[in-house]
Protein backbone atom coordinates (compact mmCIF):
# COMPACT_ATOMS: atom_id res chain seq x y z
CA UNK A 1 0.00 0.00 0.00
CA UNK A 2 1.14 3.54 -0.74
CA UNK A 3 0.63 4.69 2.85
CA UNK A 4 2.86 1.89 4.18
CA UNK A 5 5.68 2.62 1.74
CA UNK A 6 5.42 6.33 2.42
CA UNK A 7 5.47 5.73 6.16
CA UNK A 8 8.69 3.76 5.75
CA UNK A 9 10.19 6.57 3.66
CA UNK A 10 9.24 9.20 6.26
CA UNK A 11 10.68 7.11 9.09
CA UNK A 12 13.96 6.44 7.29
CA UNK A 13 14.47 10.11 6.39
CA UNK A 14 13.64 11.47 9.84
CA UNK A 15 15.69 8.79 11.58
CA UNK A 16 18.70 9.99 9.61
CA UNK A 17 17.91 13.59 10.56
CA UNK A 18 17.70 12.80 14.29
CA UNK A 19 16.50 14.64 17.37
CA UNK A 20 19.62 16.82 17.69
CA UNK A 21 19.02 18.44 14.30
CA UNK A 22 15.36 18.99 15.16
CA UNK A 23 16.37 20.74 18.38
CA UNK A 24 18.61 23.04 16.34
CA UNK A 25 15.70 23.82 14.03
CA UNK A 26 13.54 24.66 17.04
CA UNK A 27 15.81 27.58 17.86
CA UNK A 28 14.88 29.05 14.47
CA UNK A 29 11.15 28.60 15.02
CA UNK A 30 9.37 32.00 15.11
CA UNK A 31 7.28 30.65 17.98
CA UNK A 32 10.44 29.91 19.98
CA UNK A 33 11.89 33.34 19.27
CA UNK A 34 8.66 35.08 20.27
CA UNK A 35 8.38 33.11 23.51
CA UNK A 36 12.05 33.74 24.27
CA UNK A 37 11.66 37.50 23.82
CA UNK A 38 8.75 37.56 26.27
CA UNK A 39 10.54 35.34 28.81
CA UNK A 40 13.65 37.53 28.64
CA UNK A 41 11.52 40.64 29.16
CA UNK A 42 9.34 39.39 32.01
CA UNK A 43 11.16 36.43 33.55
CA UNK A 44 10.34 32.74 33.56
CA UNK A 45 7.12 32.75 35.59
CA UNK A 46 5.30 35.67 33.96
CA UNK A 47 6.74 34.94 30.53
CA UNK A 48 5.67 31.29 30.61
CA UNK A 49 2.17 32.22 31.78
CA UNK A 50 1.77 34.69 28.91
CA UNK A 51 3.07 32.13 26.41
CA UNK A 52 0.72 29.50 27.85
CA UNK A 53 -2.30 31.77 27.45
CA UNK A 54 -1.37 32.64 23.89
CA UNK A 55 -1.00 28.97 23.00
CA UNK A 56 -4.39 28.16 24.49
CA UNK A 57 -6.12 30.69 22.22
CA UNK A 58 -4.06 29.95 19.08
CA UNK A 59 -6.82 28.62 16.84
CA UNK A 60 -8.83 29.98 13.88
CA UNK A 61 -6.28 32.71 13.28
CA UNK A 62 -6.83 35.52 10.78
CA UNK A 63 -3.36 35.19 9.31
CA UNK A 64 -0.31 32.93 9.35
CA UNK A 65 0.66 31.36 12.65
CA UNK A 66 4.21 32.68 12.44
CA UNK A 67 2.95 36.25 12.18
CA UNK A 68 0.54 35.73 15.07
CA UNK A 69 3.42 34.65 17.30
CA UNK A 70 5.71 37.41 16.10
CA UNK A 71 2.99 39.91 17.02
CA UNK A 72 2.64 38.32 20.47
CA UNK A 73 6.40 38.47 21.04
CA UNK A 74 6.66 42.11 20.01
CA UNK A 75 3.54 43.14 21.94
CA UNK A 76 4.58 41.72 25.30
CA UNK A 77 8.31 42.38 24.99
CA UNK A 78 7.42 46.08 24.77
CA UNK A 79 4.71 46.08 27.48
CA UNK A 80 5.12 46.54 31.21
CA UNK A 81 2.79 43.86 32.57
CA UNK A 82 0.93 45.19 35.61
CA UNK A 83 -2.10 42.91 35.78
CA UNK A 84 -1.43 39.75 33.77
CA UNK A 85 -5.06 38.74 33.25
CA UNK A 86 -6.26 42.22 32.35
CA UNK A 87 -3.27 42.88 30.10
CA UNK A 88 -3.76 39.60 28.25
CA UNK A 89 -7.44 40.29 27.65
CA UNK A 90 -6.46 43.66 26.20
CA UNK A 91 -4.00 41.89 23.91
CA UNK A 92 -6.79 39.61 22.63
CA UNK A 93 -8.87 42.67 21.79
CA UNK A 94 -5.91 44.34 20.06
CA UNK A 95 -4.37 41.54 18.00
CA UNK A 96 -5.24 41.54 14.28
CA UNK A 97 -4.84 37.74 14.28
CA UNK A 98 -7.52 37.04 16.92
CA UNK A 99 -10.51 38.79 15.37
CA UNK A 100 -12.65 35.65 15.15
CA UNK A 101 -14.43 34.63 18.35
CA UNK A 102 -12.92 37.29 20.59
CA UNK A 103 -15.29 36.64 23.49
CA UNK A 104 -14.72 32.87 23.37
CA UNK A 105 -10.97 33.44 23.46
CA UNK A 106 -11.30 35.79 26.41
CA UNK A 107 -13.44 33.27 28.25
CA UNK A 108 -10.85 30.54 27.75
CA UNK A 109 -7.99 32.80 28.79
CA UNK A 110 -9.84 33.78 31.97
CA UNK A 111 -10.12 30.12 32.96
CA UNK A 112 -6.35 29.73 32.94
CA UNK A 113 -4.93 33.20 33.58
CA UNK A 114 -4.34 32.59 37.32
CA UNK A 115 -2.70 29.21 36.73
CA UNK A 116 1.08 28.93 37.11
CA UNK A 117 2.37 26.05 34.98
CA UNK A 118 4.85 23.57 36.40
CA UNK A 119 7.70 23.77 33.90
CA UNK A 120 9.56 20.94 35.61
CA UNK A 121 6.66 18.50 35.12
CA UNK A 122 4.84 19.25 31.88
CA UNK A 123 2.89 16.00 32.11
CA UNK A 124 1.33 17.29 35.32
CA UNK A 125 0.75 20.67 33.70
CA UNK A 126 -1.08 19.01 30.80
CA UNK A 127 -3.39 17.13 33.16
CA UNK A 128 -4.11 20.25 35.19
CA UNK A 129 -4.76 22.41 32.13
CA UNK A 130 -7.07 19.75 30.74
CA UNK A 131 -9.15 20.03 33.90
CA UNK A 132 -9.00 23.85 34.02
CA UNK A 133 -10.18 24.47 30.46
CA UNK A 134 -12.45 21.41 30.30
CA UNK A 135 -10.85 19.74 27.27
CA UNK A 136 -9.34 16.34 26.54
CA UNK A 137 -5.57 16.16 27.00
CA UNK A 138 -5.17 15.18 23.32
CA UNK A 139 -6.92 18.38 22.16
CA UNK A 140 -4.67 20.30 19.79
CA UNK A 141 -4.29 23.59 21.67
CA UNK A 142 -3.58 21.76 24.94
CA UNK A 143 -0.72 19.65 23.60
CA UNK A 144 0.52 22.64 21.61
CA UNK A 145 0.62 24.60 24.87
CA UNK A 146 3.00 22.01 26.33
CA UNK A 147 5.35 22.49 23.39
CA UNK A 148 5.28 26.26 23.92
CA UNK A 149 5.93 25.88 27.66
CA UNK A 150 8.94 23.73 26.83
CA UNK A 151 10.19 26.59 24.68
CA UNK A 152 9.80 28.90 27.68
CA UNK A 153 11.77 26.46 29.83
CA UNK A 154 14.55 26.03 27.26
CA UNK A 155 14.93 29.77 26.75
CA UNK A 156 14.85 30.59 30.45
CA UNK A 157 17.31 27.85 31.46
CA UNK A 158 19.50 28.02 28.37
CA UNK A 159 19.20 24.27 27.71
CA UNK A 160 17.64 21.83 25.27
CA UNK A 161 15.01 19.47 26.65
CA UNK A 162 13.46 16.51 24.86
CA UNK A 163 9.76 16.11 25.59
CA UNK A 164 8.03 12.82 26.51
CA UNK A 165 6.83 10.45 23.81
CA UNK A 166 3.37 10.10 25.36
CA UNK A 167 2.23 13.65 24.52
CA UNK A 168 0.72 13.56 21.00
CA UNK A 169 1.21 15.93 18.09
CA UNK A 170 -1.32 18.81 17.86
CA UNK A 171 -3.30 18.29 14.67
CA UNK A 172 -4.02 21.69 13.14
CA UNK A 173 -4.66 22.30 9.46
CA UNK A 174 -0.98 22.50 8.55
CA UNK A 175 -0.19 19.15 10.20
CA UNK A 176 -3.30 17.59 8.67
CA UNK A 177 -2.39 18.81 5.20
CA UNK A 178 1.26 17.74 5.42
CA UNK A 179 0.24 14.30 6.67
CA UNK A 180 -1.95 14.01 3.57
CA UNK A 181 0.72 15.48 1.30
CA UNK A 182 3.18 12.85 2.54
CA UNK A 183 0.76 10.09 1.55
CA UNK A 184 0.36 8.86 5.12
CA UNK A 185 -3.45 9.11 5.00
CA UNK A 186 -5.93 8.53 2.19
CA UNK A 187 -8.55 11.00 3.45
CA UNK A 188 -8.37 14.78 2.87
CA UNK A 189 -7.00 17.32 5.38
CA UNK A 190 -10.46 18.56 6.34
CA UNK A 191 -11.43 15.05 7.39
CA UNK A 192 -8.06 14.59 9.10
CA UNK A 193 -8.93 17.46 11.43
CA UNK A 194 -12.02 15.55 12.54
CA UNK A 195 -10.13 12.26 12.74
CA UNK A 196 -7.20 13.81 14.57
CA UNK A 197 -6.61 10.76 16.76
CA UNK A 198 -5.86 8.69 13.64
CA UNK A 199 -3.32 11.30 12.56
CA UNK A 200 -1.79 11.35 16.04
CA UNK A 201 -1.46 7.56 15.93
CA UNK A 202 0.55 7.77 12.71
CA UNK A 203 2.95 10.35 14.12
CA UNK A 204 3.23 8.39 17.37
CA UNK A 205 4.52 5.49 15.26
CA UNK A 206 6.97 7.79 13.46
CA UNK A 207 8.15 9.11 16.82
CA UNK A 208 8.84 5.63 18.21
CA UNK A 209 10.77 4.56 15.12
CA UNK A 210 12.82 7.74 14.74
CA UNK A 211 13.48 8.66 18.37
CA UNK A 212 11.91 12.10 17.79
CA UNK A 213 8.97 12.74 20.18
CA UNK A 214 5.68 13.92 18.63
CA UNK A 215 5.88 17.52 19.84
CA UNK A 216 9.33 17.88 18.27
CA UNK A 217 7.98 16.37 15.05
CA UNK A 218 5.36 19.12 15.20
CA UNK A 219 8.05 21.78 14.95
CA UNK A 220 9.56 20.00 11.97
CA UNK A 221 6.20 19.80 10.19
CA UNK A 222 5.39 23.39 11.07
CA UNK A 223 8.64 24.75 9.62
CA UNK A 224 8.54 22.44 6.60
CA UNK A 225 4.94 23.46 6.00
CA UNK A 226 5.98 27.03 5.29
CA UNK A 227 8.16 25.74 2.46
CA UNK A 228 5.62 23.22 1.14
CA UNK A 229 2.55 25.45 1.27
CA UNK A 230 4.06 28.86 0.55
CA UNK A 231 7.41 28.14 -1.10
CA UNK A 232 9.28 29.91 1.71
CA UNK A 233 12.01 27.82 3.34
CA UNK A 234 12.85 30.58 5.78
CA UNK A 235 14.30 28.33 8.47
CA UNK A 236 16.69 26.05 6.61
CA UNK A 237 14.67 22.84 6.70
CA UNK A 238 16.65 20.15 4.82
CA UNK A 239 15.47 19.62 1.24
CA UNK A 240 15.01 15.89 1.78
CA UNK A 241 12.55 16.65 4.59
CA UNK A 242 10.57 19.10 2.46
CA UNK A 243 10.46 16.49 -0.32
CA UNK A 244 8.67 14.06 2.01
CA UNK A 245 5.68 16.36 2.04
CA UNK A 246 5.57 16.92 -1.72
CA UNK A 247 4.67 13.33 -2.61
CA UNK A 248 1.15 14.18 -3.75
CA UNK A 249 0.35 16.43 -6.67
CA UNK A 250 -0.87 19.80 -5.49
CA UNK A 251 1.55 19.85 -2.58
CA UNK A 252 3.94 22.33 -4.10
CA UNK A 253 3.56 26.12 -4.07
CA UNK A 254 2.16 27.65 -7.29
CA UNK A 255 5.56 29.00 -8.36
CA UNK A 256 7.06 25.51 -8.70
Curated annotation (Swiss-Prot):
Highly thermostable. No decrease in activity was observed after heating 15 minutes at 80 degrees Celsius. This is N-glycosylase/DNA lyase. Belongs to the archaeal N-glycosylase/DNA lyase (AGOG) family. 8-oxoguanine binds at residues 31, 58, 69, 144, 170, 218, 222. Keywords: DNA damage, DNA excision, DNA repair, Hydrolase, Lyase. Its EC number is 3.2.2.-, 4.2.99.18. Residues 125-184 are annotated as: Helix-hairpin-helix. One of its GO terms (molecular function) is class I DNA-(apurinic or apyrimidinic site) endonuclease activity. DNA repair enzyme that is part of the base excision repair (BER) pathway; protects from oxidative damage by removing the major product of DNA oxidation, 8-oxoguanine (GO), from single- and double-stranded DNA substrates. One of its GO terms (biological process) is base-excision repair. Contains two alpha-helical subdomains, with the 8-oxoguanine binding site located in a cleft at their interface. Contains a helix-hairpin-helix (HhH) structural motif and a Gly/Pro-rich sequence followed by a conserved Asp (HhH-GPD motif). Changing residue 172 to N: Loss of activity. The active site is at residues 140, 172. InterPro entries: AGOG (IPR016544), AGOG-like (IPR015254), DNA_glycosylase (IPR011257), HhH_base_excis_C (IPR023170). It catalyses: 2'-deoxyribonucleotide-(2'-deoxyribose 5'-phosphate)-2'-deoxyribonucleotide-DNA = a 3'-end 2'-deoxyribonucleotide-(2,3-dehydro-2,3-deoxyribose 5'-phosphate)-DNA + a 5'-end 5'-phospho-2'-deoxyribonucleoside-DNA + H(+). The keyword Mitochondrion does not apply.
Amino acid sequence: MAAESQLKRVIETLRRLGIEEVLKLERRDPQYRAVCNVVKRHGETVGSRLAMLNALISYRLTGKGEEHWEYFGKYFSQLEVIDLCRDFLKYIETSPFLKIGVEARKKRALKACDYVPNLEDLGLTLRQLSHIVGARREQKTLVFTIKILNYAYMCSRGVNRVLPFDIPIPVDYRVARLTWCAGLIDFPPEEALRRYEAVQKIWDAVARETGIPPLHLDTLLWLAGRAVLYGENLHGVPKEVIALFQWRGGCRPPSE
